């Protein structure tokens, strides 16, 4: 794991990554936070997504959530990422990777996919695009 992250930092031209007190490595690329957390035999990549339009008071906007989940199902064969709601109800883009099968190039590819999916998802969560998608305009 340490060699993998050391090689990733080198290939990205960065200083070696240092985990926080919870063991999470935080990497910011193109203003997006990618958190890397070792979890047993896996490396979990998580990116919280600011999605205030997903909430309707104390409830979740089911129409928008359904649309997002349908997209996640559609990309499931090509990408290891999925959408999850964390314990606080925040939308998170997550990938679980088997450390045993992971090399630096593979990790970079997954991070690039994570960023590409974020660029696809975030515009859908702006007030204008949400209103037009669910008929609020």
Curated annotation (Swiss-Prot):
Annotated phenotype, changing residue 37 to A: In plasmid pYVa127/90
GO biological process, one term: protein secretion by the type III secretion system
Principal location class: cytoplasm
Record's subcellular location: Cytoplasm; Cell inner membrane
Organism lineage string: Bacteria, Pseudomonadati, Pseudomonadota, Gammaproteobacteria, Enterobacterales
Pfam families in alphabetical order: CesT (PF05932)
Job of this protein: Functions as a specific chaperone for YopN. It could facilitate the secretion and the subsequent translocation of YopN.
Gene3D superfamilies: 3.30.1460.10
UniProt GO cellular component terms: cytoplasm; plasma membrane
InterPro entries on file: T3SS_YscB, Tir_chaperone
Record's protein name: Chaperone protein YscB
Subunit structure comment from the entry: Interacts with SycN to form a complex which specifically binds to YopN.
Membrane-topology annotation of the record: Peripheral membrane protein
Domain of life, source organism: Bacteria
Keywords: Cell inner membrane, Cell membrane, Chaperone, Cytoplasm, Membrane, Plasmid
Inducing factors: At 37 degrees Celsius in the absence of calcium.
């Amino acid at each position: 794991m340490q060699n993998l992250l050391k090689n990733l930092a080198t290939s990205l031209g960065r200083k070696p990554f240092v985990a926080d007190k919870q063991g999470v490595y935080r990497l910011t690329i193109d203003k997006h936070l990618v958190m890397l957390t070792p979890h047993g035999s896996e490396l979990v990549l998580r990116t919280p997504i600011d999605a205030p339009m997903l909430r309707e008071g104390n409830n979740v906007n089911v129409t928008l959530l359904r649309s997002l989940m349908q997209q996640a199902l559609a990309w499931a064969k090509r990408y290891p990422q999925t959408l999850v709601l964390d314990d606080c109800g925040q939308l998170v883009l997550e990938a679980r990777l088997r450390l045993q099968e992971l090399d630096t190039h593979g990790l970079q590819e997954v991070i690039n996919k994570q960023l590409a999916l974020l660029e696809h998802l975030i515009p859908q969560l702006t007030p204008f695009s949400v209103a037009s998608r669910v008929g609020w305009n």
